[in-house]
Amino acid sequence: MKDFLKKELYSLRAVTAILARWLLLAVPTGLVCGAVGTAFHLAVEHVTEWRGEHVWLLWLLPLAGLAIVALYKLTGCEGMGTNNVIRAVHSGESVSPLLVPAIFLGTVLTHLCGGSAGREGAALQMGGSIGYNIAKLFRFSDHDRRTATACGMAAFFSALFGTPLAATLFGIMVEDVGLAFSVAFVPGFAAALIAYGVSLACGIAPTHFGLTAPALSIDTALLAAVLGAACALVSRGFCWLLHTMEHEMPRRLPNPWVRAVVGGAAVVALSYLMGVGRYNGAGMGVITAAIEQGQALPWDFLCKMLLTALTLSAGFKGGEVVPSFYIGATFGCVFGPLLGLPAGFSAAVGLISVFCGATNTLIPSILLAYELFGGAGLELIALGCGVCYMLSGTHGFYSSQLFVTEKLLSEYTASWEERLRHH
């Protein structure tokens, strides 16, 4: 009995020390990500308002592209993106601290001059870089820096959207599809809550949509499933277009300076052809109108797809997540009523489903629905989201994601089995 108590006491001390170490990491990560995330949110918000008041700024997009190319060359961050941060979680690959100012300024310039991009891709890169480098500063091991990278991603996502639980699960599940990097949950959630608290203290309201949902029934469940299946096609199409253009643009225009100017000019021309302002920037106003007012144009999702793919493939910065919200919400708003579902509710199903299909993150997407919509229609949204997840295949934004299990089969993938053998 005495030996048993000694072992238990030793074990308790050990796990307490480990927990304290993770909290030591979570506090500065949450504070720094909260502060930088708040500054980033305010910067993007202000330049978006300024661009709306000064439409002529759109004509400066090619010049902004040149500035971004110069900025990335100056900081040595050429070619770095969200995939690098995900690889850091997989293997402990280093993440440059200069990625933070590079993606911060690059995204602000993109939004100032009307590029069609989001914020969350930038948030994942900045958060991952901050978490990794704080762990490096504290002399954490290479393996523990992987956890720190995931914590930073969760904290920055939380600061921007005000969804700490979804942000945490996203940060620990986006790397390996079908597996949760569970050791990062407690420090990641602590960092996310701290970052969320910092953003609230600075006056940043969490993202929330008012949503009226139909009653749960066999009919509405079937319709939500059909809508989810349609969203899987949209998700596949968006990811295919992104990857195709990101491959073709550098092949056809290998000079990054020329690519930025030509791509920027093309975005300007298409913006005037499609409607200045509607497809530029993140488009949160259009998303809100689709969900809360049931208003969207039939071609909105296609126009946003094209402009976002063109913007990002030309070298502008931001991300794909908020554009996926836009595409899903506007598609759902238009397609859902054809099935007999309310337009606003269909927009909510579309937003979550396309996001889920494009990021391959089922559980975080369902939690995001809860935090964005306050639980309204959660069962139906989760059903549509689940169907979209299963039918979206291995298509996704992030080529560095590893698929631990097949989406439609109860077995590990060959790539995961190979990875286990290497360890």
What does each model-identified segment do?
Residues M1-H423:
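Alpha-helical transmembrane segments and immediately membrane-proximal extracytoplasmic
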